[in-house]
Amino acid sequence: MSNVPAELKYSKEHEWLRKEADGTYTVGITEHAQELLGDMVFVDLPEVGATVSAGDDCAVAESVKAASDIYAPVSGEIVAVNDALSDSPELVNSEPYTGGWIFKIKASDESELESLLDATAYEALLEDE
């Protein structure tokens, strides 16, 4: 079973979301997602300042196996991207919940968080796959 940190929220598309002290949210892909994709070779990051809606594809993770869209779990403005992934995309594999984050978003509608999964619900989703 993949590591599923209890303090995070999750999407059904295998993104995770963590609220930061400044009110923004950090987004990445789950350990389960990176295991399915395999070794990352490139991450196409979104543009800082871009406005996205929940469910929009806003980044791409390219691995030795496939390219997979990364979706915005909530609507808002992209306020930062993980530039370290340009030189070290493998951080998505080795540190999916820490150094391998993809982007930070300032949510425009926090009620959308209610549609995300908690760790227990995400673990149940993984068991059903």
Swiss-Prot record:
Keywords from the named record? Lipoyl
Which Gene3D superfamilies does UniProt cross-reference here? 2.40.50.100
Cofactor binding note: Binds 1 lipoyl cofactor covalently.
Keyword Cell wall biogenesis/degradation assigned: no
Q: Pfam families this protein is in?
A: GCV_H
* Names of the cofactor(s): (R)-lipoate
- A GO biological process this protein is involved in? glycine decarboxylation via glycine cleavage system
Q: Where is the Lipoyl-binding domain?
A: 24-106
At what positions is N6-lipoyllysine found?
A: 65
Asked if the record carries the keyword Cell division, the reply is no
Sorted alphabetically, the Gene Ontology cellular component annotations on this record are: cytosol; glycine cleavage complex
| Subunit and interaction comment | The glycine cleavage system is composed of four proteins: P, T, L and H.
Concerning NCBIfam families, the annotation shows: gcvH, PRK01202.1
> Briefly, what is this protein's role?
The glycine cleavage system catalyzes the degradation of glycine. The H protein shuttles the methylamine group of glycine from the P protein to the T protein.
Q: Which family does it belong to?
A: Belongs to the GcvH family.
Please state what the protein is called. Answer: Glycine cleavage system H protein
Gene giving rise to this polypeptide: gcvH
